[in-house]
Amino acid sequence: INLNKWGGFIHEKVLISMGGTYEPIDPIRGITNKSSGKMGLELAKQAYIRGFDVTLIVANVSVRIPSVFNVIKVETAEEMNKAIKKLIPSQDIFISTAAVSDFKFEDKDTHKIDSSKALSINLKPTIKIIRQIKELNPDIFLVGFKAEVNISKEDIIASAKQQIKDAGTDLVIANDVSDENCHFGSDNNKVWIVDDDIVSVPLSSKKEIANIIFDVILEKI
């Protein structure tokens, strides 16, 4: 890793995915999630402050993205997958904060569906983007996020370690979004940073958490 005279990183590239994807059922309806993009944006700011070359792949977010960032806008899981696959080979770090839809509609209707009738829909799984990353770039430092709901600390950590096993992530940021003040869209969170070690971060602002995450990343790379 090369440093400039201020301690910043030269030519080191960070890719961050953020926000929630949207899967259309017809031209005006679809399914999405409550991801706000706040954590991804705080991580992007940390990367920028530390001198990295930052690119953001942005789905649906509730935050304003500063113009200093190179931004690629996407909507669906498929669009995000294509954008990531194109960029991953040239990146040094990928931080996957986006909440990507696990399912999409098998048949998207080209017209507005009649709301006066009962509706039965078929869903099929989307591609697990994070599981492709190490195949495309074995040398990349891969950071995953794992959001769980109403489970024990031990189970959250076990879930994070399972992602490491399945996707080859180098680091996983895990949390329980059912905790008070830690839900999607909140300004605070409580997380566990998991690899061979486990760093427990108590309830803190997402800005503070982003700073801690980057400190850990820089210890590992």
Roles of regions detected by a PLM:
Residues W6-I221:
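A cross-family phosphate/adenosyl-ligand binding-site feature
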